[in-house]
Each structure stands twice: as C-alpha cells, then as structure tokens.
Amino acid sequence: YPDVAITLPNICRAMDAAAAAGIPVVVVQHLMPSGAPVFARGSDTAALHPEIARRPHDLLVEKTMASALTGTSLGGWLRERGIDTLVVVGYMTHNCDDSTVRQAHHEGWKVELLHDATGSLPYRNAAGAATAEEIHRVFTVVMHSNFAAVASTEAWLAALAKGEALPVDNVFLSNQRAITA
C-alpha cells in the first residue's frame, strides 16, 4: 500500500522532475547473497524495475543493509557535493525508507519523503499482524512527527517549482493535535 499503479508513476515523476531541476538522482539497489529469499544478486527480486533502470541517475548505490547510508559511499558522495536535503521515494516505507530517513536525520540532513511514491507490505508474525495500509500510515505519521517532511508527490512538485522546502512538523505538535482531536 499504496498500490504500485500509484507509487511507480509517482516515483518516476519525482525522478524526472529532480533531473530536470538539476537535482542529483541517486538510485539505490538492495542486494543480498545468492540464495537469499529476496534481493539475491542476479535474481528477479533484486533487479531494478525497468522504469527505474531506464531513467538517468547520477549515482547507483548497491546496499546490503536497510539504510542506504550504512556501509555505502552515499554519505560521502552527498557531503562532497554539499547536498543538504534527501528526498526519499521507493520501497519499502517501513524498512529501507524508514531506516534511511532516520539515519539521514541523525547525521544532519534534511529529509523529505513522498508518501505516495513509497509503499509497504502486510506482515504477520509472532508479534501480531498489520495490513500494508496500517504499516504505511503509522510509519509516515511517525516520520513526519520528527524525522522527515512527509508529503504527496504533487505537494513536492509544487514546492520544487517554487524553490521551497516541504513544511516539517514536530513531536510535540503532532501529539497535541492527537490528544485534542
């Protein structure tokens, strides 16, 4: 959730708009050793989606951990270029996106996440069960309370056209609005 029929076109729109605006585009690929249940190097689950693969990008990052900043050259590459803001799109909201958002925030970058250009999957395990929509909603609400400015692709495109950053929120106000609603 949201459906890939919504998220994939939004991911592509964001990539295209960033490239047109001269904003560096970084593609991140999660790769695991052969034999892994998902993302095994050379497998279909590790391949970039053709729509992503065909788009121009400034850097391709191969990672083995959830965060795109852990064990990769991405942080140094961003610092060398004086990049102060990361716009996060792609999958999965609750795993790679959340991990990257939090690490980037902790390391001092401003972070923006496009909620309709990211997505989650449903889970069931010993801790319980949650739908993809529940997971996506909870993670984006929490990210927006402290770690990232979370907005739609349309809102980001409008802010980009105006040369503005997305508005950020904070933990206190997010909580106060919830308890007074």
Positions of PLM-derived features:
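Glycine-rich, proline-tolerant flexible connector loops at the mouths of alpha/beta enzymes
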Residues: 1, 34-36
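Charged, well-structured alpha/beta interaction segments
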Residues: 5-8, 24-26
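Active-site-adjacent betaalpha module
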Residues: 9-16, 20-21, 38-181
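Von Willebrand factor
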Residues: 17-33
